[in-house]
């Protein structure tokens, strides 16, 4: 939440971003306003210096309201380094920043199929300016959340499925592999 009236920005899987206002009122009516639409399955959102960034399945999008009318006029491709195929399960989830302003998100693997692109089942780091990205760790089936701590450590969850019976939370280490063989690439990933 941000701003004087404690408003929130919310994204939906259907491709919309909404602003919710009135959250600071003890009782009363919330106001919902759709400000952006047409994005590819956005499942992560981060506000940095009053600018909304949205993590979509195909890219991180920076939203611009050029004429201050409360609706987005320009959808900027901030970074689209991560690759995606047509498979239904390849969600890109969450969007967090570290103390230096770099972005982090989780990229799901192909459900019950081997990975086709290097980003399947990975945690991705994107530079503050959006010019480059790195795969931090992989071995995830459906990572559905990332938490970045002030000390630089971070965690990511992974959803249960046919390979693990419960959701779990992982302390993420650089170049770590977290067990889901559908995102394993021989010669790249640790034995």
Where do the model's predicted regions map?
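Beta-propeller domains with acidic blade repeats across secreted/periplasmic ectodomains
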Residues: 1-191
């Amino acid at each position: 939440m941000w701003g004087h009236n404690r408003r929130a920005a919310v994204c939906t899987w259907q491709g919309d971003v909404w602003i919710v206002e009135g959250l600071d009122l003890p009782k009363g009516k919330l106001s919902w306003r759709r400000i952006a639409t047409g994005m590819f399955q956005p499942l992560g959102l981060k506000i940095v210096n009053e600018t909304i960034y949205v993590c979509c399945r195909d890219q991180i999008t920076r939203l611009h309201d050029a004429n201050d009318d409360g609706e987005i006029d320009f959808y900027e491709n901030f970074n689209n380094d991560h690759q995606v195929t047509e498979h239904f399960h390849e969600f890109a989830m969450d969007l967090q920043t570290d103390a230096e302003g770099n972005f982090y998100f989780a990229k799901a693997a192909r459900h019950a199929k081997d990975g086709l692109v290097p980003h399947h089942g990975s945690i991705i780091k994107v530079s503050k300016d959006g010019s480059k990205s790195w795969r931090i760790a992989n071995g995830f089936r459906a990572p559905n959340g990332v938490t970045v701590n002030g000390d630089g450590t971070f965690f990511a969850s992974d959803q249960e499925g046919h390979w693990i019976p419960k959701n779990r939370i992982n302390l993420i280490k650089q170049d770590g592999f977290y067990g889901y063989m559908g995102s394993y690439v021989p010669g790249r990933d640790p034995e």
